[in-house]
């Protein structure tokens, strides 16, 4: 009898906690199915900490989550059985390719199968919590100190760049690109972006007009970018999103759907200059190209 009373007492408290979320958040939670528990775990983590800005940040991520998804693939044998393989389990991409070749020898007619999965169905609480905490670690760096909190939420806080497979990237990128804090200290935004571009060209190959990706993978994941060290303009644009956001620099992807002089689209990035005016920049070319918005 006492146990029943305790359960009845806890249930209204739980329902009350659910109702404290903004309407937009509740709408996404209603679509999340079994993964709702992960989203509420992340929300409640920050609610319990009581930091009003971090609460707004996690609410922003969840409220806008239902439109986002990942495009990925897996390997399947001739019987339709999924064959386990994770290229990030190997120290280098060359090792991963060798392992894949071994799998192909062991499994007849190994073929890639494309699939998509929604963020609201798959994202984990720990991933969201880490993303928010690390984004706030760089929020007050010199590049971000002039922007509004809404701009921070739109262009630094987000955990993905496009439709790439989700991978826990912030800690790795914060460490890999932390050198920019010394190298570009006191420099203009344009000069800072040139530092990033110079670094990228030392280790990342632009594969445009050189090779086409054989797997049905529209975008490399954040950690795949660091391991494969090559990709076309859309991957380079995503790489810049991860690298700049990891250091507290506002950035987003931009694109031209069709060139007047050629077929196909082209991807690049946008940010704000020191006067807080939007500028486009493209690091995929031999020198960084800057253009202002009309």
Where are these regions (language model features)?
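Residue-level marker of intrinsically disordered, low-complexity segments enriched
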Residues: 4-8, 59-60, 111, 277
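Bacterial Sec-dependent N-terminal signal peptides
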Residues: 1-21
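Secondary-structure boundary elements
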Residues: 38-41, 49-228
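Hydrophobic/aromatic-rich core segments of domains that either
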Residues: 21-33, 47-48, 182-199, 213-223, ...
């Amino acid at each position: 009898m006492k146990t029943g009373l305790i359960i009845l007492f806890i249930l209204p408290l739980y329902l009350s906690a659910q109702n404290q979320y903004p309407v937009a958040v509740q709408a996404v939670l209603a679509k999340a199915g079994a993964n709702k528990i992960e989203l509420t775990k992340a929300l409640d983590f920050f609610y319990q900490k009581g930091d009003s800005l971090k609460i707004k940040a996690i609410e922003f991520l969840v409220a806008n989550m239902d439109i986002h998804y990942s495009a990925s693939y897996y390997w399947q044998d001739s019987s339709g059985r999924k064959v386990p393989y994770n290229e990030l389990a190997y120290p280098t991409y060359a090792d991963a390719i060798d392992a894949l070749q071994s799998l192909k020898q062991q499994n007849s007619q190994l073929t890639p199968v494309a699939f998509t999965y929604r963020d609201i169905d798959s994202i984990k609480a720990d991933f969201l919590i880490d993303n928010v905490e690390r984004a706030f670690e760089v929020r007050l760096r010199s590049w971000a100190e002039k922007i509004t909190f809404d701009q921070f939420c739109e262009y630094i806080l987000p955990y993905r760049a496009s439709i790439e497979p989700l991978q826990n990237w912030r800690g790795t990128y914060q460490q890999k690109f932390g050198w920019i804090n010394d190298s570009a200290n006191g420099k203009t935004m344009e000069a800072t972006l040139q530092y990033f571009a110079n670094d990228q060209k030392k280790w990342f190959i632009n594969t445009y007009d050189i090779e086409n990706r054989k797997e049905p993978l529209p975008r490399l994941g954040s950690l795949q970018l660091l391991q494969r060290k090559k990709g076309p303009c859309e991957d380079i644009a995503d790489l810049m999103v991860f690298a700049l956001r990891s250091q507290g620099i506002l950035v987003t992807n931009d694109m031209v759907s069709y060139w007047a002089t050629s077929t196909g689209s082209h991807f690049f990035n946008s940010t704000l200059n020191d006067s807080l005016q939007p500028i486009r920049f493209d690091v995929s070319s031999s020198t960084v190209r800057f253009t202002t918005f009309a």
